[in-house]
Amino acid sequence: MSFRTIEWRDDSVIMIDQTRLPGEEVYNTYTDFKAVAEAIRGMVIRGAPAIGVAAAMGIALGARDIIADTHESFFRQLENVCDVMARTRPTAVNLFWAIERMKRVAEAGRDKPLDGIRQLLKEEAIRVEEEDLTICRNIGKWGATLIPEGATVLTHCNAGGLATAGYGTALGVIRAAHEAGKKIQVFADETRPWLQGARLTAWELVKEGIPATLISDNMAGFFMSRGEITCCVVGADRIAANGDTANKIGTYSVAVLAKENNIPFYVAAPISTLDLSLCDGGKIPIEERPAEEVTCIRGVDIAPAGVRVRNPAFDVTPARYISAIITENGIVRGDYRAGLRRIAGN
């Protein structure tokens, strides 16, 4: 990879600023947990796996800066750090998975000196990043088996290296197929209102030399109906026990169109994105973001002042529209409730 999404360096967190892409490749340095939380909230970093990594690193920064004379005081303040992280973005379950993982590590080290606990948290945050790279490569290897030679793959939003520690889930599948020598091309939905497809996915694909075509969101059905799309691959922010999947707003529309046109629709996500505590997607919390994201683009108003706006950041695709769910442990089809529990080791 020719870029790093996020890394721990010299007791700081370094992130590529995704709000500046594709025009500028800028890396920001964060030295306190509140700044990391704001970066997550402001979508400097986004994508469920990347948010999980950022949260873990933010907690490690917060733990480092806690001033405490007793373990009781330290753990009370650490809980506050975790609460700040938890309030950043409600839909991506990887955020809460990472927070709980860091809490367990701290609790397991409770008998150590405070500096020892801080060190454990730092090491765990780095481990979360390293594991994500391995997980995404495994997702890619499994998923590449579903991509035929000569395929044209449609993807929505950005589930690439920028949405993870650096390889990608949906784009990891595409990247792995490309690395295996398959001659494929990609259609990327622009993905309003944040334009993650236009700004981020297209940027990654061009950078990697993978043939890419950018389309607006309302063109997907047109190209499907003409037989120009072989399959669809998207990422996920939360997957319920029955396979219902929350992903970037507009994913549901793509899935329905794919079903209508008999096109396979695949979801690629790590096990950490599964939320088996939810029986179905109706229980997934959906983040609503500011109206300005819809009415303005790069500071330019594109709608009349005073118009009412709704801006849900995600929608839920029912499992019946999903052909398969690709994880690092394998591919699940059909009975998602049983298959996801099996592949998650539950």
From Swiss-Prot:
UniProt KW keywords: Amino-acid biosynthesis, Isomerase, Methionine biosynthesis
Residue sites binding substrate per the record: 46-48, 89, 196, 247-248
Reaction catalyzed: 5-(methylsulfanyl)-alpha-D-ribose 1-phosphate = 5-(methylsulfanyl)-D-ribulose 1-phosphate
Domain of life: Bacteria
Catalytic center residues: 237
Site note Transition state stabilizer, residues: 157
Biological process terms in GO annotation: L-methionine salvage from methylthioadenosine
Pfam families: IF-2B (PF01008)
Single annotated GO MF: S-methyl-5-thioribose-1-phosphate isomerase activity
This enzyme's EC code(s): 5.3.1.23
Pathway: Amino-acid biosynthesis; L-methionine biosynthesis via salvage pathway; L-methionine from S-methyl-5-thio-alpha-D-ribose 1-phosphate: step 1/6
Function in brief: Catalyzes the interconversion of methylthioribose-1-phosphate (MTR-1-P) into methylthioribulose-1-phosphate (MTRu-1-P).
Family: Belongs to the eIF-2B alpha/beta/delta subunits family. MtnA subfamily.
Name under which the protein is recorded: Methylthioribose-1-phosphate isomerase
Annotated organism of origin: Pelobacter propionicus (strain DSM 2379 / NBRC 103807 / OttBd1)
